[in-house]
Amino acid sequence: MTREKSIQATVDYFTSGEFTQTLARRVAYRTESQNADSGPVLLSYLTDEMIPALQALGFDYLIVENPVGGKGPFLLARRMEPEAALTLLTYGHGDVVRGYDDQWREGLSPWELVQDGNRWYGRGTADNKGQHTINLAALEQVLKARNGHLGYNVKIILEMGEEDGSPGLNEVCAQYRDWLSADLFIASDGPRISAARPTLFLGSRGVFNFELRVEAREGAHHSGNWGGLLSNPGIRLAHALAGMVDARGRILVPGLRPPAISATMRHILADIELGGGATDPAIDPGWGEPGLTAAEKLYGWNTLDVLAFVTGNPHKPAHAIPPRANAHCHMRYVVGSDAANFGRHIRRHLDDNGFADVEMVNAVSHYAATRLDPNDLWVEWGKESITRTSGVSAAVLPNFGGGLPNACFSETLGLPTLWVPHSYPACSQHAPNEHILADTTLEALKIMTGLLWDLAEQGADIVRQRSQLQKSQSAETV
């Protein structure tokens, strides 16, 4: 069978309704990892749903208990061929955020796949059940087309805690490094830059969360009796934040800013257009770092945002000076940032500017920033394959704007990482009415079928060329 016939077989599979049935069954699992009572259903998704599907494709498997107590389990699976020229590792997560059942529009439920025209609604359709279902369906079609022989091994890690911060994932990758060893990582999560343009991203921005707090005194005091005599925690905290990021969103603390954007990065991002969709918010052109394009701000720069700010009782304000104020903040940061010292930079800045009373707590980096070299041979291979299938020039992003546990694969396992997202920016991911688009889903199935077919045809050559290039570069440094 040819590449084209394999892709057509995938189209036939989609139109038969089998894909829809599989996804509907998976959406029905209430796999809310942020719900402490979800342990049994998290395990059931793996044992009752995913393991039978993978066994049918010739995989053997391990269920791995999370090294972090009380958190979701992992499924490690592999399909090995005796004379395989390379090994592919892929990933997905079967957990979802909370359903927020009562907030969905009339006629919808987070635990039921509902088709409404081009939109298919259900929790996990976009993040991530729909995406790993697409990839496994494409793998099944390529296996059938090639009579069960790919010429490469396939390994899979499915976690059930990504929406809870991926607890234990890095530890499992380290413990099972040999079991998970591979030549290439391809997975899917997050949105394309737009529904109409297939996307390939090479890593993700990191996430650094922290809370700033002012505890001035016990209890509130009447503003008529004490106003002008007692410091106001809300005002103190507002001014502390204003010294860290200006009124237009520009980061003012030098240690929190990234390195200058390289010429290579600017070239890659030059053709990336953001926003403009029917449901996209209007971009504020004057917000963020001056002199950067929208794409450079999102994919090549750091941001500092206030997520929540509370002082007093906003719902029942009183004529009293509040005793405390706190702000939950976070940063999205790119490779090259001094993330290990973000906390120290913030503390020093506050102290140097007279804000010793502002306490920083719960400072933690959930995801590290990662980025595959855009000149890596796998990048051009992936872009060409996606473009060939879709007929649209694939957008290549140096990193995803959001956070992903990519460091587990790129750093702990040492793999080149390619992410091919299948949702789109307005998919209501993490919100009520989450959905995917049927036409984008079909295109994604075709893209992944082509990609996995091309890996069988060209993967061994890429592995060989990369090895030769690395040897040459090593010799030059000696």
Please place each PLM-identified region on the residue numbering:
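N-terminal helical capping/dimerization or prosegment-like subdomains
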Residues: 2-101, 324-326
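Active-site metal-coordination/substrate-binding segment of hydrolases
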Residues: 85-155, 178, 443
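A short core secondary-structure module
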Residues: 227-248
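An extended, acidic, His-containing surface patch that forms the Zn2+-binding/catalytic region
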Residues: 83-85, 194-195, 251-316, 320-324, ...
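Short glycine/proline-enriched loop/turn "hinge" motifs that connect secondary-structure elements
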Residues: 15, 104-105, 147-148, 201-207, ...
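A common structural junction motif
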Residues: 94-95, 244-248, 347-356
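Histidine/acidic-residue-rich, glycine-tolerant segments that coordinate divalent metal ions
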Residues: 151-232
